[in-house]
Amino acid sequence: MAAMETETAPLTLESLPTDPLLLILSFLDYRDLINCCYVSRRLSQLSSHDPLWRRHCKKYWLISEEEKTQKNQCWKSLFIDTYSDVGRYIDHYAAIKKAWDDLKKYLEPRCPRMVLSLKEGAREEDLDAVEAQIGCKLPDDYRCSYRIHNGQKLVVPGLLGSMALSNHYRSEDLLDVDTAAGGFQQRQGLKYCLPLTFCIHTGLSQYIAVEAAEGRNKNEVFYQCPDQMARNPAAIDMFIIGATFTDWFTSYVKNVVSGGFPIIRDQIFRYVHDPECVATTGDITVSVSTSFLPELSSVHPPHYFFTYRIRIEMSKDALPEKACQLDSRYWRITNAKGDVEEVQGPGVVGEFPIISPGRVYEYTSCTTFSTTSGYMEGYYTFHFLYFKDKIFNVAIPRFHMACPTFRVSIARLEMGPDEYEEMEEEEEEEEEEDEDDDSADMDESDEDDEEERRRRVFDVPIRRRRCSRLF
C-alpha cells in the first residue's frame, strides 16, 4: 500500500531536481524571479542562483563581464544596485543607454570635441527640481537619458547636427535640463513645450510636448513653424520629428552611426542619402543626398526649403586621358502637382571642376518647393581635357525631397469662416499694393524676378528669414 501511495503521489515543483528547476527559473523575468523568493525557502535559494541574474543585468542594464569584474560584485547584487538607482526607467534604459554608447563610440575618433562637450548625468533630485519648476512631469525616457548625460556644453559643433549654406549656418546643441527648463513655454501656441536643442546662430529649437495641449500629442518632438499668414501669434504649425523622446533620439543615433549622416569637418551634417540615388555614366559616378531645413520653411504660406549635396567621382581605374572638366548643368524640377521647370546654366556654384581618375568633387546647393515634396534630375555636360572638342553628358540621378509630417496649428483650425475670409482679403489687398508699388519700375522688377528664379535653382542659396530666439 505504501508503495502504491509513493507511486501515485503528485509531482510538485518542489519535488523537482535542482537542474530542471534552475532551467525553468532561467525563463522567468526579473519580477517573477523576485516573486519566487517569497514562495518557499527552496525557491528562494534557487532564485538567488547568481547565473540567473546575468541575463537580466545584460538585458536591462547592459552590464558587461568587464564591468562586473571591475565592480567585484555578483550579478544579483549588480542588478539590485542598478535597479535602486535607475529602476524607474527599466523599460527605457537599455535602448537609451545603447544609443548613447553607440553614439560616443562612433564619434570619439571622428568628433572628439563633441564627445568632450557632453556633461555628466543629472541626479534624480535635479530632475525632480525641474519638474517642480515647470509644474509638469518630464517623460521617463527623457529623464532616463539625462541620468546618463545632462546634455552638452553650448559649443559648436552641436551634437544634434549641423547644416551650412553660403549664407546660413545651423548647429544644434543638446540642452542640459536646467537650460531647457529656462526655455519652458507657457505662452499660447507652444504651451507645455520644453526645448530639447538650441542653435545659437538661428535660435532654432526642437521641442518636446510634456503635456497634450493645442492639438499636440504628449511626448511628441517637433520643430515649431510660425504661421506667417495668421494674425494670431499663437498660430504655430509643427514639423513632427518623433513620436517620443526615445523614437527621436534613437532614430537620430541610428542615422549617425550607420554613416547615413556624413561627418564633414568634425561635424554631423543631417543629409539623408538614398543608396539607390546613384547614377554612373562611363567612369563618372554621381550620387546625391538631401536635407530639409525647417528654419527656412513654412506651412503657411507653403514654402519648403531643401538643400542637397552632390558627389561627382571618377573611377580610379579610368584612363588618364578620360580627365574632363564640367561645363554646364541641366535641371528638370518637378513638384508634387506635376509642374515642371527646366533650367540650365554654366558650371556649378560658380565653379567648373576638373575630374580626373580617383578624384572626387562635392558641392552643396538648395531649392524650394511650394508643395510638400518634389524631385530633381538632370545631367552635367563635360569636355575632355585632351580632346576639348569632344563633349558628353553625365546623368544626375533623380532625387526626391519631402518635408516631414506636419500638423497645422489648432489656432488656424479653430478660425471662424468670416475671420479666415477677412484674412485672405487683407492678404490679397497687400499683394495688390505690392504690385502697384512695383509697376513703376517694371523692367527692374522683371530682372529681380529672373534673378530670384535663377538663384532658386541655379545653385546659389537664397537668404530667407531666420527664426527668432524663443528664450
UniProtKB/Swiss-Prot annotation:
Task: Share what the entry says about its subunit structure, partners included.
Answer: Part of a SCF (SKP1-cullin-F-box) protein ligase complex SCF(FBXO3) consisting of FBXO3, SKP1, CUL1 and RBX1. Interacts with PML, interaction is direct and takes place either alone or within the SCF complex.
Q: Where are the transmembrane segments?
A: none
Where in the cell is the protein located? Answer: Nucleus
Q: What is its main location?
A: nucleus
Q: Which species is this UniProt entry from?
A: Homo sapiens
Residue ranges occupied by any F-box domain in the UniProt entry: 10-56
**Pathway(s) of this molecule:** Protein modification; protein ubiquitination
Q: Where is this region: Disordered?
A: 419-455
Q: What does UniProt give as GO cellular component?
A: cytoplasm; cytosol; nucleoplasm; nucleus; SCF ubiquitin ligase complex
GO BP annotations listed? protein ubiquitination; proteolysis; response to lipopolysaccharide; SCF-dependent proteasomal ubiquitin-dependent protein catabolic process
Annotated Gene Ontology MF terms?
ubiquitin-like ligase-substrate adaptor activity; ubiquitin-protein transferase activity
Q: Alphabetically list the UniProt keywords.
A: Host-virus interaction, Nucleus, Ubl conjugation pathway
Q: Pfam families, from UniProt?
A: DUF525, F-box-like, SMI1_KNR4
Q: Which residue stretches does the UniProt record annotate as biased composition, category Acidic residues?
A: 419-451
Describe its function.
Answer: Substrate recognition component of the SCF (SKP1-CUL1-F-box protein)-type E3 ubiquitin ligase complex, SCF(FBXO3), which mediates the ubiquitination and subsequent proteasomal degradation of target proteins. Mediates the ubiquitination of HIPK2 and probably that of EP300, leading to rapid degradation by the proteasome. In the presence of PML, HIPK2 ubiquitination still occurs, but degradation is prevented. PML, HIPK2 and FBXO3 may act synergically to activate p53/TP53-dependent transactivation.
Q: Which InterPro entries match?
A: ApaG_domain (IPR007474), ApaG_sf (IPR036767), F-box-like_dom_sf (IPR036047), F-box_dom (IPR001810), F-box_SCF_Substrate_Recog (IPR052121), Knr4/Smi1-like_dom (IPR018958), Knr4/Smi1-like_sf (IPR037883)
Q: Locate the ApaG domain: which residues? A: 278-408
The identity of this protein, by name, is F-box only protein 3
